[in-house]
Swiss-Prot record:
SMART domains: ETS (SM00413)
Residue ranges the UniProt entry marks as DNA-binding: 112-195
Statement: the UniProt record of this protein carries the keyword Nucleus: yes
Keyword Ubl conjugation: no
Effect of disrupting the coding gene: Cell-autonomous defect in the development of red pulp macrophages, but normal monocyte and other macrophage subsets. Mice show normal trapping of red blood cells in the spleen, but fail to phagocytose these cells efficiently and develop an iron overload localized selectively to splenic red pulp.
Tissues and organs where the protein is expressed, per its UniProt entry: Expressed in lymphoid tissues, including spleen, bone marrow and thymus. According to PubMed:19037245, highly expressed in red pulp macrophages and, at lower, levels in B-cells, but not in other cells, including, monocytes, dendritic cells and other tissue macrophages. According to PubMed:10464163 expressed in pre- and mature B-cells but not in immature B-cells; according to PubMed:10187812 not expressed in pre- but predominantly in mature B-cells and at lower levels in macrophages.
Similarity-based family: Belongs to the ETS family.
Role of this protein: Controls the development of red pulp macrophages required for red blood cells recycling and iron homeostasis. Transcription factor that binds to the PU-box, a purine-rich DNA sequence (5'-GAGGA[AT]-3') that can act as a lymphoid-specific enhancer. Regulates VCAM1 gene expression.
Name of the protein: Transcription factor Spi-C
Length: 242
């Protein structure tokens, strides 16, 4: 009887142990499942391992780069590109300079006046068949009779007129200059003279009897008088004497 009781007690003990093992096994299985789900959220690409040995380096080695290095490198590249762009803009702004006298006289700039155009033509060797100096030191010039209309047409184009300019209209403007004293009519056919004030402003060195270098006008369609920097500023800010 005692032997049977011991066997039953031993069997119950084994059964309890088996139940505990089964419960523990079930709990570990549940934990493993939850752990796998959690790891799946953290690392959605489980085939990419986070072990440093997988990348061929020891765990104590520093990474080849970090995000700060990448950010700083990008900033340096951006600043370098901006610097070159600024240099390029400065170079372009230096290459494209607005003319001192615009053809149609944009806002803030003067229109090219007739006596300025005549002086420019006198300084241009290509216009010698239309207009010539008679006495350069005194500012006396003369229109060439057979080509005076050509000169007038070119003046109209420089002004931007739609209708062709004629010498008759240009001569009318010259008579208006005679009233202000800027250009004086000489008692000689097609001959005029710049006033001293205008001549001083247009060519002060020439007026003083010194040799003045007149540059060749490579672009005749430019609507401005080619003077040196000092002459241009002096002329622009000076007042005319009547």
């Amino acid at each position: 009887m005692t032997c049977c009781i011991d066997q039953d007690s031993l069997g119950q003990t084994f059964q309890d142990a088996i139940d505990i093992l089964i419960q523990q096994s079930a709990g570990e299985s549940q934990y493993s499942s939850e752990n796998r789900n959690y790891m799946a959220i953290i690392n959605p690409y489980p085939h990419v391992r986070g072990n440093a040995n997988y990348y061929g380096m020891s765990p104590t080695e520093n990474p080849l780069y970090d995000w700060r290095g990448v950010t700083n490198g990008s900033a340096d590249l951006y600043l370098e590109g901006g610097f070159h762009q600024s240099v390029q803009n400065i170079a372009e702004s230096q290459l494209v300079q607005p003319p001192f006298f615009q053809q149609k006289g944009g806002r803030g700039r003067r229109k090219l006046r007739l006596f300025e155009y005549l002086f420019e033509s006198l300084c241009n060797s290509e216009m010698v068949s239309c207009i010539q100096w008679v006495d350069k030191a005194r500012g006396i010039f003369q229109f060439i009779s057979k080509n005076k209309e050509t000169l007038a047409e070119l003046w109209g184009q420089r002004k931007g007129n739609r209708k062709p300019m004629t010498y008759q209209k240009m001569a009318r403007a010259l008579r208006n200059y005679a009233r202000t004293g800027e250009i004086i009519k000489i008692r000689r056919k097609l001959t005029y003279q710049f006033s001293e004030a205008v001549l001083q402003r247009l060519a002060p060195a020439n007026y003083l009897g010194k040799d003045l270098f007149y540059p060749q006008y490579g672009q005749p369609d430019q609507g401005y008088l080619s003077l040196n920097h000092w002459n241009a500023n002096h002329y622009a800010h000076g007042s005319y004497q009547s």
